[in-house]
């Protein structure tokens, strides 16, 4: 059946994207090509990713696939490969945001902040703060480019979120306070 073939093709492409992304990350860390290839296969074939696809979390899967190469861009920039690091970071931030799973990208920002903090400490100890600030500037520009490429998508997602159940809370403050102050009031014991 044609429909089943399309599903298998999509899973193969998604798995390849996952492998390639992790391969790029391992290469940025200086791992040899064959070990990076093996690492990419092991990463892509971990069970969690294959649970996401049949569960219908395709865009979460794709967003997660673009996180390792985004980290690779950050690593490259702080290893004084400013242009390559900036391009890789901008490209994969743009692809991450295009995947439209903003929640995963938001959580990923905290990982990046941790990396930046670690690189700052390292640069401070080595007295290489000018290099740190140059790399950070390149990465900030890359982030702006990645976001600006998707500004229309982000705006429409923001507008749409106001109309969904994930928009504003339906809880009323007075109701919440009643439940907090008298949690057993409605229980029949």
Spell out what each predicted region is:
Residues 125-134:
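Membrane-interfacial, low-structure loops and terminal tails that flank and connect transmembrane helices
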Residues 189:
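Cytosolic catalytic cores of cyclic-nucleotide second-messenger enzymes
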Residues 11-12, 132:
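A generic secondary-structure micro-motif detector
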Residues 157-177:
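Extracytoplasmic catalytic-loop and juxtamembrane helix elements of membrane-embedded
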Residues 16-29, 33-122, 135-157:
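Membrane-embedded helix bundles of polyisoprenyl
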């Amino acid at each position: 059946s044609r429909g089943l073939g399309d599903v298998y093709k999509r899973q193969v492409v998604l798995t390849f994207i996952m492998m390639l992304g992790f391969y790029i990350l391992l290469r940025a860390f200086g791992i040899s090509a064959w070990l990076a290839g093996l690492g990419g296969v092991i990463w892509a074939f971990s069970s969690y990713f294959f649970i996401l696809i049949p569960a219908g979390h395709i865009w979460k899967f794709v967003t997660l696939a673009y996180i390792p190469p985004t980290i690779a861009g950050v690593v490259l920039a702080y290893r004084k490969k400013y242009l390559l690091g900036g391009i890789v970071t901008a490209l994969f931030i743009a692809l991450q945001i295009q995947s439209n799973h903003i929640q995963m990208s938001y959580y990923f920002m905290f990982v990046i902040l941790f990396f930046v903090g670690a690189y700052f400490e390292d640069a401070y100890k080595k007295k290489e703060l000018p290099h740190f600030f140059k790399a950070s500037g390149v990465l900030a520009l890359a982030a702006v480019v990645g976001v600006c490429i998707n500004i229309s998508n982000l705006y429409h997602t923001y507008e749409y979120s106001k109309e969904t159940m994930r928009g504003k809370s339906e809880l009323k403050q007075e109701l919440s306070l009643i439940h907090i102050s008298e949690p057993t009031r409605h229980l029949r014991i």
